[in-house]
Amino acid sequence: MKSMALSLAATVRCSIVVTLLAALYGCTPATTQSGSGGIVPPPGDDRAPLEWARSEPYLILVRRSCRTLTLYQYGQWVRTYDKVAFGRVPGAKVQEGDRRTPNGLYRIVGKREHPRWSRFMLIDYPNLSDRDDHRKAVEDGIAVTGPGGEIGIHGTDKERFNELGIDWTLGCVSLMNEDVEELYEFVPDGTLVLIED
């Protein structure tokens, strides 16, 4: 029990240091610099319009390194939520049970109330790109289970973890309950969700 408490204390200290460094130097997700090809604004400029998303009724942009989820309507900024938590293990999702949050472009494919997390919005992970990445990981001997599923955006029963920036989910994106309830009312099934580092 003592080692578990020490481990949690170390995790909290690490999380605080990362949060302070991000605040001092700005968060710079790798995909914003290269992978997304400039389709999203640089960190700290989430209020800038997204020209390519002007035909989308809603778009959710999740930035793991900034610990934010931003909602756009027809390419225009609506709201940015902070206190976001992710899968316990950093890095891109490879297989079921790896406790990682996937990166990529998805759609919300189902919404429901949830007894533990207030609201749950299911995304269409794994998409074709994820399945291809998983196939390659199996061929390379990296993945030994399927790609996984049941990834979504939900509330929290660990509010303090979200507040401290501690990642605790099995791969989902977690918001504070009042935030996920507000988002849930805004976005319909079919909403685009872009998750990046």
Set out the residue ranges of the language-model regions:
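Bacterial N-terminal signal peptides that target proteins for export
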Residues: 3-16
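Short, solvent-exposed loop/turn elements at domain surfaces
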Residues: 69-72, 80, 91-94, 116-119, ...
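Electropositive
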Residues: 79-107
